[in-house]
Amino acid sequence: AKGHGLIMVMGKGGVGKTTIAAALAVGLVQRGHSVHLTTTDPAAHVQSQLDGSLPGLKVGRIDPRAETQAYIDKIMATRGKALDDAGRALLLEDLQSPCTEEVAVFHAFSRVVNEARTAFVVLDTAPTGHSLLLMDATGAYHRQMTQHYQGSAGGAMAKHIITPLMRLQDADMTHVVIVTLPEVTPVSQAAALQEDLRRAHIEPWAWVINKSVAATGTSDPLLQARLAGEQKQCERIAQGLAQRTFVLPWLTEPPVGVEALGGLVTADGLLSH
């Protein structure tokens, strides 16, 4: 690894994104890197997954409510400074729009993407629908910026701007990891997510198949139907969907704590690439 970059862990709710993100972050720290592990998922419990602290690992979250309030405060302190009371009241009313949260979260996301220029950032994303809204905002900002700069100074500035979307499209900078379960519906949903990303010219780096019973090595006859179904989905992923595939076994206890999380990526080989 070159010492910096963004790893985005994506997928539907309930597939184990937070676990995979935490394991990747711990694995990178154990290899001597400084890492910022953060999440856009309001329901994620990244800190409880780690169950402690680790030197070199910073844990944070993009909290939509806090980011929105900070954004409103900033706009009121800058744009609202020169306004009278009536003008400030109107501006504040405008800022109560649902769009404000989208903009505020996008700005926070952009800061995280920018941070990955000099350090490792592992981003545990919100479930697919929320994440695609964030991707839409990222795309809209990119179009707005390129149009703005193409229209000024003969378009010369447009060649020099680098938007967050361009960083996500840069395979040297960003690795998108899609997490799924070895079942028909989760795999189909992950495939749809991948198509959405590809439309934005973002190519997923790898898929992680989580909670695989087959990977436990069991030969229990009661599980044969389950194993056959898993095998079919794993083949579907490997043969036509993923550039790289990593399989994690079904565990009786979820991996909690630095040791268990670090062992997860070591056993899987996910960080040896």
Predicted regions and their residues:
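Switch/connector loops and helix/strand junctions flanking conserved nucleotide-binding motifs
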Residues: 45-48, 67-70, 129-134, 187-188, ...
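A conserved catalytic-core segment of Leloir-type glycosyltransferases
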Residues: 55-85
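Phosphate/Mg2+-binding loops and adjacent switch elements
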Residues: 81-184, 189-192
